[in-house]
Structure formats: C-alpha cells, structure tokens
Amino acid sequence: MTYRCLLPMVLLLCFSTTALSRSYSLLRFQQRRSAEVCQKLLGQLHSTPQHCLEAKMDFQVPEEMNQAQQFRKEDAILVIYEMLQQIFNILTRDFSSTGWSETIIEDLLVELYGQMNRLQPIQKEIMQEQNFTMGDTTVLHLKKYYFNLVQYLESKEYNRCAWTVVRVQILTNFSFLMRLTASLRD
C-alpha cells in the first residue's frame, strides 16, 4: 500500500521542482526582494573618507551589462548567478581592516547564498541544455572583472580604502542585477 502512494508522490515532487524552477515571475519577485535587502545591508556598512574614492580604478564593467534588456531569460540567469557567486566570494575575504559589522556581512552572505540557491536549479538546467548565447561570453567578461577587483584588494593588502572602492563597485553591481532580474518573465 505504501509503495503505491510513494510513486505518485515522487513523480509529483519531481514535476513540481521542474515547474517551480521555470517560474520566472516568482523567481523575479524573490530575487528583486533579496537584492534590495543586499543593497540595504551594503548601505549599512561603515564608509570611509571621500579620499578613498578618489583612488578608485576603472575596473571596466563588461559592456554587455549596460544592455540588460537584450538578454534572454536564460542568459540573464547565467549572468545573475555568476555575479552573485563572485560577490559572495569577494565578501568572504579579509575585511577586518574595514571596521564593518560581522553580523551585517553574515546577513549579506546569507542573502547572497539564498539567491544562488534559488537560481541554481534553473542555472543547471540551462547549462545541461546548453541553451545560452550572450550569457557565456558575458560570464567570461565578468570573471575577468571580478578577478581585477580581487587583484586590487590583494595589491592594497585588503586595506580600508580598497574595500571602500570595492564596496562601491558591488553596490553598482546590484543596480545591474536589478535590471537583469527585471527581465525575468514567464
């Protein structure tokens, strides 16, 4: 008796997971809300004097990021996922010189992780289907961009001014993320 009920339950669970993973409207809502929380948390981090921003470098955000409306949903998912993953990795580095609240950073990391968790099933589906065009080249450009941010932090020995510059870059990234998220429609 138990086995007869088990098969329909497993099938229902598999179907609902697939159906949920492709519900872009729900995903858009969840991602937008979470990105707003991340922006708010980043805004709560103590800033340093204005002179730190004068030392900023031109990190050259990939050109494609200025054309978010041209991304297909699948490409947008790949790009959003990559950006979140890279931001997460940066924020797990040594920020002790900043005086930032560890609680705020932990909350930020939890939000980022939650966003990546929601995106991962769709991201995996897209990668398996190899159903991407613009996203794959943009991801390569993003990796270079984030590599440059990490190199900058390392060259400045993770000092407070370097973190201020990177924090501003990450805040700018969330503007891009919001635009990309807005393009997710069923």
Curated annotation (Swiss-Prot):
Glycosylation site positions: N131, N173
Signal peptide: 1-21
PROSITE patterns recorded: INTERFERON_A_B_D (PS00252)
Cross-referenced SMART domains: IFabd
GO biological process: adaptive immune response; B cell activation involved in immune response; defense response to virus; humoral immune response; natural killer cell activation involved in immune response; positive regulation of biosynthetic process; response to exogenous dsRNA; T cell activation involved in immune response
Disulfide-bonded cysteines: C52-C161
Keywords from the named record: Antiviral defense, Cytokine, Disulfide bond, Glycoprotein, Secreted, Signal
An example Gene Ontology CC term for this record: extracellular space
Subcellular location per the Swiss-Prot or TrEMBL entry: Secreted
Pfam families noted in UniProt: Interferon (PF00143)
Record carries keyword Glycoprotein: yes
Protein role: Has antiviral, antibacterial and anticancer activities.
Assembly description: Monomer.
Similarity-based family: Belongs to the alpha/beta interferon family.
Name the UniProt record assigns to this protein: Interferon beta-3
Annotated organism of origin: Bos taurus
